[in-house]
Amino acid sequence: MEFSVAHPAVKAFMCGSLSGTCSTLLFQPLDLVKTRLQTLQSGVQPGTGRVGMVTVFVNVLRTEKLLGLWRGVSPSFVRCIPGVGIYFSTYFTLKQRYFSSGAPGPLQAVLLGAGARCVAGVFMLPVTVIKTRFESGRYRYSGVFGALRSVCQTEGPKALFSGLMATLLRDAPFSGIYVMIYSQTKHLLPPEISQSSYAPVANFSCGVLAGVLASVLTQPADVVKTHIQVSPDVFSRTSDVVRYIYKEHGLVGFFRGAVPRSLRRTMMAAMAWTVYEQLMAQIGLKS
């Protein structure tokens, strides 16, 4: 099938997948550092020295060398390339179906972003579980497919969907908030900027602002999700993780890893949306 005659949703999928590839490769180290920071909570007792982002970063370089920062990039690719594609194609389809006559309002933008993320999140959750375990450093899998086989044999297929509720509680609000802020701030741009050669830079800046706010608001759900997926034998329910984190580390425990996650999610989302919109414009489709 030639690209020029492909269905618009297929084109949106391809543009989204390409944008996801670029952003994932660039910002994978931040995701690894975020995961290590969050999973360190299990082994750090209250009152001990604080382990920060720089400490984890240096430790990875010392023990696993430079390429260690890209540990887990294979499952990240397996997740993000189709995952981002599914997200953008779903978003495009929903927007064309319900808002083809005009731009969605703030609440409608939230529903669009959250709905598209839920669809992509459910489809890609098994790979998300494997990616999180790869990055944690606690598991020694031979590869993505070896990890899938190992989990199914030792824990059952159900383990591949561990943290589903926490993942949706994190990703759906993040995407909804992000799309709402991103779309509304873009509308505030004057025409001389939004219609000029500086539009990609301006759009990226809007994406950064939206990403920071959305990341901070959804950080607690990300911490809970990571604990469930890394230690499914210890935490069987979301409420168990919430009680554990609060008891051992207080409210601050829910924001462990916030800096690297905010950096990564913000930069990845801003880049993915900017690249996606530029690619869609190049092929004559309104994103």
Curated annotation (Swiss-Prot):
One annotated GO biological process: hemoglobin biosynthetic process
Keywords: Membrane, Mitochondrion, Mitochondrion inner membrane, Repeat, Transmembrane, Transmembrane helix, Transport
Phenotypic consequence of gene deletion: Fishes lacking both slc25a38a and slc25a38b display anemia.
Membrane topology, record value: Multi-pass membrane protein
Catalytic activity: glycine(in) = glycine(out)
Mitochondrion in keyword set: yes
Tissue expression: At 24 hours post-fertilization, expressed predominantly in posterior blood island, posterior cardinal vein and circulating blood, as well as in somites, brain and retina. At 34 hours post-fertilization, becomes restricted to posterior blood island and circulating blood.
Residue stretches spanning the membrane: 13-38, 72-98, 110-135, 163-186, 202-228, 257-275
UniProt-listed InterPro entries: Hem25/SLC25A38 (IPR030847), Mit_carrier (IPR002067), Mitochondrial_sb/sol_carrier (IPR018108), Mt_carrier_dom_sf (IPR023395)
Annotated GO MF terms: glycine transmembrane transporter activity
SUPFAM superfamilies per UniProt: Mitochondrial carrier
GO cellular component labels: mitochondrial inner membrane; mitochondrion
Compartments (UniProt record): Mitochondrion inner membrane
Superkingdom assignment: Eukaryota
Gene3D superfamilies: Mitochondrial carrier domain
Solcar repeats: 7-97, 104-188, 198-282
Family statement drawn from the similarity comment of this UniProt entry: Belongs to the mitochondrial carrier (TC 2.A.29) family. SLC25A38 subfamily.
Function, in words: Mitochondrial glycine transporter that imports glycine into the mitochondrial matrix. Plays an important role in providing glycine for the first enzymatic step in heme biosynthesis, the condensation of glycine with succinyl-CoA to produce 5-aminolevulinate (ALA) in the mitochondrial matrix. Required during erythropoiesis. May play a role as pro-apoptotic protein that induces caspase-dependent apoptosis.
The protein's name: Mitochondrial glycine transporter A
Organism for this UniProt entry: Danio rerio (Zebrafish)
